[in-house]
Amino acid sequence: MSIVSSGDILKILKERIEGFDSPVKTSSVGDVVAIKDGIALVYGLSGVKFGETVAFSSGVRGVVAGLERDTCSVVVFGEDREIREGDSVQCTGELMTVPAGLSVLGRVVNPLGSPVDGGNAIVADSRLPVEAKAPGIMARQPVCEPLQTGIKTVDMLIPIGRGQRELVIGDRKTGKTAIALDTIINQKKTNDTADAKNRMYCIYVAIGQKNSSIARVVHKLKETGAMDYTIVVAAGASDPVSIQYLAPYAACAMGEFFRDNGMHCLIVYDDLSKHAVAYRQMSLLLRRPPGREAYPGDVFYIHSRLLERAAKLSDDLGGGSLTALPIIETQAGDVSAYIPTNVISITDGQIFLESELFHKGFRPAINVGLSVSRVGSAAQVKSVKKVAGSMKLTLAQYRELEDFARFGSDLDPSSQAMLEKGRRFMELLKQGQYSPLSVEEQVAVVLAGADDCVNGIPVSEISKFERGLLERLRAEHGGLMSSLSADIADDIKGKLLEVIRGFAASF
């Protein structure tokens, strides 16, 4: 009987183990040490990366937001009441992704990409990472195509181009969301006749809004037929702060699908003030040191890295665009606060809405003097440029003269005439909600004011005159109107002024 030594046994075992080729998948597993206010402290996840998605044994997911020597802090995306101390946590080795593509259009989803409209599950064309690097310098081209909002004041004086970041800023209840919704609704005119590549797809992101407000927005988009080309990403006020924080990044990833495939997308962030508050709350729970107004030191970076993803790509990369309309809410018109100044410095201009104008009945309540578009004028249509050239000067002179008149100063006849012209111009710029105008209609209306065609009409009758003029032009001068969409030749301008003066004389 032969004796087998321990060395032989070890050699045989080693050969057997080395010859064992069954695939084995290893993953890092840890345990929940503590869970509070949507933040889980996890021990034992060796090799986990910052920003990596982890899965709890209850099925809830989270993302790693802080790393220590033996533990990591995980932001929970969902209800933390389902998580208990001692639950196992597993690394996934993946980053956070959301569904993207044409199949998501017309749906209301949460920031995780799950439908919340009661419809069927979304079968996505692709899944894209929530956090993505913004396009570099050479990947971009200057803004060169206009994005029509349908709002006279914006399209004429503060034009927006495809790929621009234009801030909408103002106090609560001054019509910020109304401007964004009108812009989305106005895209229907273009989208009904354009092919898939030239359509303007839209994404509306509700951050920390009341569920009733989100429902009202969705209802209006459906009612106007705009939901067909729109995605609504909803993170309500009752959702965890982690979900509210994730919302704009998830929506931006959905918009990047269109941008990177040579298409065009408009994204509305409503609003980034609440997003900053959600991030502040999350950072304090993660025990990060607070700074000014208790915001963490990187609050500027969370918005800059988001808004830099909006761009007009070069033709080599398909020429697609992602246009951003971030909304910021101010307190008592204070634009010098921390978050407003941050976002103003990041964006390419701002549309400033004023409570005083709103309460006077001037709507949209846009303060033209404080509003600016730094890059959009390069994309303005030629016909619009020609008629809108003198508008800013006229309105600035009117504001100055109005201040003099308010103090009872006597004005000479020319100043009095300028004041009367300015009043009629301001009245012409008024516009009802959900009633966007085409470029041709805007050119006709502004031309009527610029060439003194409305001087003899009482200020109280200007709105009625505008409605009647547009009805006459649509019904009897369709050919003349269609020629205004690109440029306005002198003979066309003469014919249009003849029609306007004739209507004004018979009004």
Swiss-Prot record:
- What protein family does this chain belong to? Belongs to the ATPase alpha/beta chains family.
By its UniProt entry, which SUPFAM superfamilies does this protein fall under?
C-terminal domain of alpha and beta subunits of F1 ATP synthase (SSF47917), N-terminal domain of alpha and beta subunits of F1 ATP synthase (SSF50615), P-loop containing nucleoside triphosphate hydrolases (SSF52540)
| CDD domains linked to this entry | ATP-synt_F1_alpha_C (cd18113), ATP-synt_F1_alpha_N (cd18116), F1-ATPase_alpha_CD (cd01132)
EC code: 7.1.2.2
- What the protein does? Produces ATP from ADP in the presence of a proton gradient across the membrane. The alpha chain is a regulatory subunit.
What is catalyzed by this enzyme?
ATP + H2O + 4 H(+)(in) = ADP + phosphate + 5 H(+)(out)
This protein's assembly is summarised as:
F-type ATPases have 2 components, CF(1) - the catalytic core - and CF(0) - the membrane proton channel. CF(1) has five subunits: alpha(3), beta(3), gamma(1), delta(1), epsilon(1). CF(0) has three main subunits: a(1), b(2) and c(9-12). The alpha and beta chains form an alternating ring which encloses part of the gamma chain. CF(1) is attached to CF(0) by a central stalk formed by the gamma and epsilon chains, while a peripheral stalk is formed by the delta and b chains.
| This protein's name | ATP synthase subunit alpha
Alphabetical list of InterPro entries matching this protein: ATP_synth_asu-like_sf, ATP_synth_asu_C, ATP_synth_asu_C_sf, ATP_synth_F1_a_nt-bd_dom, ATP_synth_F1_asu, ATPase_a/bsu_AS, ATPase_F1/V1/A1_a/bsu_N, ATPase_F1/V1/A1_a/bsu_N_sf
Q: What is the lineage of its organism?
A: Bacteria, Pseudomonadati, Pseudomonadota, Alphaproteobacteria, Rickettsiales
Q: Which GO terms describe its cellular component?
A: plasma membrane; proton-transporting ATP synthase complex
Instruction: Name where it's found.
Output: Cell inner membrane
